[in-house]
Amino acid sequence: MTHPRTCLAIGLAVLGIAPAIHSQPRQPPDPMKAITTSFNNVHKNLLEMAEDFPADKYGFKPKPEMRSFGEVLVHVFSGTTYAAKAGRGEAVQWNELDPKSYVDKAAVVAGFKKAIAEADATLKATPSTRFAASPEPWLSVIEHSAEHYGLLVAYYRLNNLVPPVSRPKK
């Protein structure tokens, strides 16, 4: 008879504590940390694709009217370059970089690395209070880059390749 009472007492105690545990307020994520983490993640994945995709397929287009794999990457880092300049407070217009200036895979990868480094330096130099006021231009460039990451996954699959992040972990 004491066993059921003990179980009941323990059960009621747990039920009494559970709401208190769950009701503790959670701190919202720091805007600067959230933006920086998202920016770094999407650009790390894109750079990994840029370095991994076969050089002889950089000119691949799913349809003639679409950008090639290499042209998509140049388009993406045009946005990254824009964000770096706008993030520093420069009066800047979106100026599309000319993909013809990036003649091969090595040039595209180097240009992308440069754009990421420039944006990373701007992010690190930006006071965290700035992000609380507005996440722009960073939120827009993260969204833009992520959209094109998804597009480039299709380029991989159309070439019977597996994107780096979809491969089994070693």
Per-region residue spans from a language model:
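Bacterial N-terminal signal peptides that target proteins for export
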Residues: 1-10
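N-terminal signal peptide c-region/cleavage motif recognized by signal peptidases
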Residues: 18-20
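Acidic/histidine-rich, surface-exposed loop or edge segments in extracytoplasmic proteins
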Residues: 25-30, 89-101
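N-terminal beta-strand motif that seeds the catalytic metal site of vicinal oxygen chelate
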Residues: 27-39
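Short, contiguous alpha-helical
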Residues: 36-40, 44-47, 57-96, 132-170
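Acidic/histidine-rich alpha-helical segments that form the ligand environment
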Residues: 38, 100-145, 149
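Well-ordered alpha-helical scaffold segments within catalytic/enzyme domains
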Residues: 45, 49-50, 84, 118, ...
